[in-house]
Amino acid sequence: MALKTIDALDLAGKRVFIRVDFNVPLDEQRRVTDDARIRAALPTIKHAIQARAKVILGSHLGRPKGKPDDREKFSLEPAAQRLSELLKQDVILADDCIGDGVKKLVRDLKEGQVLLLENLRFHPQEEKNDEGFARELATLCDVWVNDAFGTAHRAHASTAGMAAFVKEKAAGFLIQKEVEYLGKALGSPERPFVALIGGAKVSDKIKVLENLIAKADAICIGGAMAYTFLKAQGVAVGKSLVEEDKLELARQILERAQARKVDLLLPVDHVCGAEPKDTAERVVVNDRAIPDGLMGLDIGPKTLDRYRQRIVDAKTVFWNGPMGLFEQKPWAEGTFGVAQAMAQSPAVTVVGGGDSAAAVEEAGLVSKMKHVSTGGGASLEFIEGRVLPGIQVLEG
């Protein structure tokens, strides 16, 4: 995939619009509780500042629905404040993203200054990829840079539509890194290539599994989706979560893996409880079958050892989806055990966004991984082999 990146452009004196992903979690006092996405955009922003660009940043935050208190609830003000601290320079926050007031702020921008536009989703035209809105945003800049991998799977005005109305466009360093690592893991991985796939539903991961069966040497399954596979094999799963309407599909996936000589590993023991609560008694079931009255809530110690061994032997490891209900302590060992094993591995370790990225962050192991994706849905669609609109418009 040939992407032109921001460092290939002369930015001096130019108005450079960078689409970032500052969709960050906030507490009740509207303080940023996790600034990972802001920090992920810093290399691109700092490059533009040092290249003497007039830097204009655009992002969304949450899902405003046009209610009167939305302006306060979904304002990017907390992100502007955190960015200012990280850059150690003032960040100007506009009170809108289009209009005469914004145009004046852009006109007054000096080289190396940073202007953050207010939440793009305050305008419903953003998500509709409205041509007029995209054109109006494009009038603010000479160069358009997309560095928002988290929204690259959305064809919105600022993530894709603007590209048609600017002469110069490029990918930021974050998108470059995402495409490079996810693309390498799926395109030309060093072997053995092991994938760990977890999460609640087989239905969420069908395309991912189909794509990985064509590429991986082994796939380790965890999370609640494992019980649908086990039941499809005729194994008793107690009251574990099962997608009854996906049993035939699970059988087909198992057959396909076997036909392609891909080792598809399922749990051989389980950590169970009577209900999915952290107050439930933690029962280790030392068998593939789960007794009636119990539900599987995490992979068991023997399974974790098997999966660890696969990680140790691998040259490339890709992980997407938790191994259990890791948000609750009694059921978190499998997920954090996998994270630990990947952190200690010399292999190319790629974590595909969402809950797995959150687990790696919580365990303080981000720096030990080769790449932790910033995009939940976007990384999933990339792994499914789908075209991402926000990247497609940058190709060539």
From Swiss-Prot:
Coiled coil: none annotated. Keywords: ATP-binding, Cytoplasm, Glycolysis, Kinase, Nucleotide-binding, Transferase. Disulfide bonds: none annotated. One of its GO terms (cellular component) is cytosol. Substrate binds at residues 21-23, 37, 60-63, 121, 154. Transmembrane segments: none annotated. PROSITE patterns: PGLYCERATE_KINASE. CDD domains: Phosphoglycerate_kinase (cd00318). Its EC number is 2.7.2.3. It comes from the Bacteria. It is found in: Cytoplasm. ATP binds at residues 205, 296, 327, 353-356. Its main location: cytoplasm. It catalyses: (2R)-3-phosphoglycerate + ATP = (2R)-3-phospho-glyceroyl phosphate + ADP. Monomer. This is Phosphoglycerate kinase. It comes from Anaeromyxobacter sp. (strain Fw109-5). The gene is pgk.
